[in-house]
C-alpha cells in the first residue's frame, strides 16, 4: 500500500534511485495505491548522468509492495520493499531495463512492455 509521502525505490535504468509519491491517481479521495496502480512521483535521489534529474515530476506504476497482493487462490505475494517504474506522458516506461521481479498483475494491455522487460514475473 503506497500513499502520499511514501518513498519507493526505482526498478529501472532511468538514473533515478529513490522517488517520493506525491499523488495517487484515480479519484479525488483515493488514498492508497497497490501493484499496477499509477502514481505521481518526485525524484528524490538520482545518478549523476542519468536520464532523469532530482526534483523532476513523473508518473510511475507500482511494481512491488511490501504489503503484498492477495491472489484469487488465496496466496499472498510480498516483497522486501516498495518499487516503481517511471513512465512518460503516454504511460510508456522511460527506461529500457527493469530490475528485480514484477507480479503477474501487471499483465494488462497498458503494462505488457514492463512485463516483457522484467527478468522474472511472479
From Swiss-Prot:
One GO term (biological process): translation
One GO cellular component term: cytosolic large ribosomal subunit
Organism (species): Verminephrobacter eiseniae (strain EF01-2)
Main function: Binds to 23S rRNA. Forms part of two intersubunit bridges in the 70S ribosome.
NCBIfam families: rplN_bact (TIGR01067)
Keyword NAD among record annotations: no
InterPro entries: Ribosomal_uL14 (IPR000218), Ribosomal_uL14_bac-type (IPR005745), Ribosomal_uL14_CS (IPR019972), Ribosomal_uL14_sf (IPR036853)
SMART domains reported for this sequence: Ribosomal_L14
Keywords noted in UniProt: Ribonucleoprotein, Ribosomal protein, RNA-binding, rRNA-binding
Oligomeric and partner information: Part of the 50S ribosomal subunit. Forms a cluster with proteins L3 and L19. In the 70S ribosome, L14 and L19 interact and together make contacts with the 16S rRNA in bridges B5 and B8.
Gene3D superfamilies found in the cross-reference section: Ribosomal protein L14
Coiled coil: none
Keyword set includes S-adenosyl-L-methionine: no
Protein name as catalogued: Large ribosomal subunit protein uL14
Protein family (similarity comment): Belongs to the universal ribosomal protein uL14 family.
GO molecular function: large ribosomal subunit rRNA binding; structural constituent of ribosome
Amino acid at each position: 500500500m503506497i500513499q502520499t509521502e511514501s518513498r519507493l525505490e526505482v526498478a529501472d535504468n532511468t538514473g533515478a534511485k529513490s522517488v517520493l509519491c506525491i499523488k495517487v491517481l484515480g479519484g479525488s479521495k483515493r488514498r492508497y495505491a497497490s501493484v499496477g496502480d499509477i502514481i505521481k512521483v518526485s525524484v528524490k535521489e538520482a545518478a549523476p548522468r542519468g536520464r532523469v534529474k532530482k526534483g523532476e515530476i513523473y508518473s510511475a506504476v507500482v511494481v512491488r509492495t511490501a504489503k503484498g497482493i492477495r491472489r484469487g487462490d488465496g496466496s499472498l505475494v510480498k516483497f522486501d520493499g516498495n518499487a516503481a517504474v517511471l513512465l512518460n506522458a503516454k504511460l510508456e516506461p522511460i527506461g529500457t531495463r527493469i530490475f528485480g521481479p514484477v507480479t503477474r498483475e501487471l499483465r494488462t494491455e497498458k503494462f505488457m512492455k514492463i512485463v516483457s522487460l522484467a527478468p522474472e514475473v511472479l
